[in-house]
């Protein structure tokens, strides 16, 4: 059942440098009238329209976010015995800020379709510029993190 329509809205987090028009998408809330009662967006924006070279977020520019990511790594390491050479994976790794908090003797891997512009931050880490899927990371990791990413996944 329709609840609220805000019409077509510009996609957030996208900063066009060339003055071109930012893509827009419908922003309509609907309510499941079945047993679930879920309030959700009616439409999903293709992930390639949001994440890529024009995605503008950078984890490292916000001190609160840097502190939070440091805490996430501290908590993960307190639960898992990380040994030299163990693989740690950050899905949606952005500029590599979270991975910077692991010791340099860990094999630090970031996967992010928007991270090509941050390649310099990954000199001592592995970067896979793509969306996460089994085919581009068939290995096992000792610790896997993903911050503020799952709400962008449709299924």
Regions found by a protein language model. Give the residues of each.
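N-terminal juxtadomain amphipathic helix
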Residues: 1-63
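Conserved SAM/SAH-binding beta-strand->alpha-helix loop
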Residues: 114-116
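Conserved class I S-adenosyl-L-methionine
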Residues: 83-94
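A conserved beta-strand element that flanks and buttresses the S-adenosyl-L-methionine
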Residues: 142-145
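Conserved SAM-binding strand-loop segment of SAM-dependent methyltransferases
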Residues: 121-137
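Conserved SAM-binding loop of SAM-dependent methyltransferases across substrates and taxa
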Residues: 95-105
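A short, conserved alpha-helix within the catalytic core of class I
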Residues: 152-155
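Conserved SAM-binding motif I beta-strand of class I
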Residues: 107-112
């Amino acid at each position: 059942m329709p609840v609220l329509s805000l019409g077509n809205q510009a996609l957030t987090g996208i900063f066009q440098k060339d003055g071109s028009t930012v893509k827009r998408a419908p922003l309509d809330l609907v309510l499941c009238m079945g047993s679930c009662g879920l309030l959700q967006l009616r439409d999903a924006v293709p992930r390639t329209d949001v994440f890529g070279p024009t995605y503008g977020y950078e984890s490292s520019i916000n001190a609160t976010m840097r502190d939070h990511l440091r805490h996430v790594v501290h908590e993960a390491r307190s639960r898992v015995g990380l040994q030299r050479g163990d693989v740690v994976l950050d899905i949606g790794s952005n500029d590599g800020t979270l991975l910077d908090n692991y010791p340099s003797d860990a094999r630090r891997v970031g996967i992010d379709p928007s991270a090509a512009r941050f390649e310099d931050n990954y000199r001592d880490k592995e970067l896979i510029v793509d969306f996460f899927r089994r085919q581009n990371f068939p290995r096992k990791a000792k610790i896997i993190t993903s911050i503020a990413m799952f709400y962008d996944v449709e299924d």
